[in-house]
Amino acid sequence: MSRYGRYGGETKVYVGNLGTGAGKGELERAFSYYGPLRTVWIARNPPGFAFVEFEDPRDAEDAVRGLDGKVICGSRVRVELSTGMPRRSRFDRPPARRPFDPNDRCYECGEKGHYAYDCHRYSRRRRSRSRSRSHSRSRGRRYSRSRSRSRGRRSRSASPRRSRSVSLRRSRSASLRRSRSGSIKGSRSRSRSRSRSRSLSRPRSSRSKSRSPSPKRSRSPSGSPRRSASPERVD
């Protein structure tokens, strides 16, 4: 059923500041004095409040006027309509504000004539704090986002880069080993051929030196007489 009566008003009433030992029967007796009731519901977890619903919204308004601030179930209760603008109880009024004194000083700047919440320095501080907080939050968000993105990129690019670098290193080391072994073998063969050629050339040179003909002896004219080729004929 609707909580609004035929006159269009609110039929449910909120009851606050109830004690933990509040009973349903005592609430029904207190509120049924103003009119017939539909339901009475008491909160248990957490305790301390209840809802009473009337059949007529005018009875609900009368109960709010008559029972607000009264002692029910051993405690002074607060009674108001459950929706709309709540009716303030005389026990829930805020404390009266201190009257303005021109001789009072502001504890922010030490000047007279205003309080801290009206001070221009206090308003500047609040603005700077809010700006610094928003700036630090945006910085933290940007840093966390960029860090997470860089981590994802690193994790994605790390495995192919590592595999490529490992394969390149292996191929380079193998080629270097091959070239080094080939150069060592070539140098060894060259040194051996050079040593052999040297060993062979040495005795040949000595032999050639020993076999070289001795210098020709020059025959003096006083030597043995030359033989004439043919005797002269006498006619």
Curated annotation (Swiss-Prot):
Pfam families: RRM_1. It is found in: Nucleus; Cytoplasm. Residues 11-84 form the RRM domain. This is Serine/arginine-rich splicing factor 7. Belongs to the splicing factor SR family. The modification N6-acetyllysine is found at K24. Residues 123-180, 187-219 have a biased composition (Basic residues). PANTHER family: RIBONUCLEOPROTEIN RB97D (PTHR48038), SPLICING FACTOR, ARGININE_SERINE-RICH 1-RELATED (PTHR48038:SF3). Extensively phosphorylated on serine residues in the RS domain. The keyword rRNA-binding does not apply. Residues 81-98 are annotated as: Sufficient for interaction with NXF1. Residues 153-223 are annotated as: 6 X 8 AA repeats of R-R-S-R-S-X-S-X.
